């Protein structure tokens, strides 16, 4: 597979998957989702690969699923939205189900679907510039992969999701347990590879089985069924389309995404950043 929107290389048993649409803050479009799937196939099949690291090119991890692509394609109705949401969900969950450890290396914005991808990884190492969030409800969209309440608890997840938090600081993310380590921005890749190489020194079969055991502690409580139920609810949101989402997209088409985001944010009182 020829990659256009990601870069993929393997060195010293570490597969490095780079989201590479820096002009679009590495937004996850359909092509990128296909390429992530292809790269994960390669990493899982290659016995030399022991750890997968995902990072963003430039100064962002990713702004999430590509709103500009939605704006241009104009999906409407349940039949059009169902395969879109299913693909989004399945790609994010590749990192949860991958038999090899997965690490998200995050700098800058890590939002919406990209935030969900980082949550699906086994570890997240973040630069001091990183920030996180789930802004979807502020413009009438739903949550594709509802992992957050499983990792931070229902009360905090409701706060972040209901309020459309999009500037959750790296320090707060560390306090909540969704970031493992904060490192200087200039050393993000080096620090992440150091952790990855530590994992590479452990018997891969042992790591695989232990990952299964840890994931099972949540799956046994119903995580996978709950995620599928939440995905079905998201389809109920996106299928008919909300008034806010339609207004947001109309402004984006007429004036651009920056104008639509300004309209979105102007409707809400400014809150202290966390």
What are these regions (language model features)?
Residues 1-11, 165-170, 190, 194-197, ...:
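C-terminal alpha-helix plus adjacent terminal tail
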Residues 1-57:
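Conserved CoA-thioester-binding segment of acyl-CoA-metabolizing enzymes
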Residues 17, 21, 35-36, 54, ...:
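Terminal peptide-recognition signature
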Residues 24, 28, 74, 168, ...:
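Ligand-binding pocket scaffold of soluble enzyme catalytic domains
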Residues 31-35, 87, 94, 191, ...:
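Charged catalytic carboxylate motif
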Residues 56-91, 110, 256:
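Glycine- (often His-adjacent) and acidic-residue-rich active-site loop
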Residues 88, 145, 154-157, 207-210, ...:
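A general structural signal for well-ordered alpha-helical segments in protein cores
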Residues 93-204:
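Crotonase-fold acyl-CoA enzyme core
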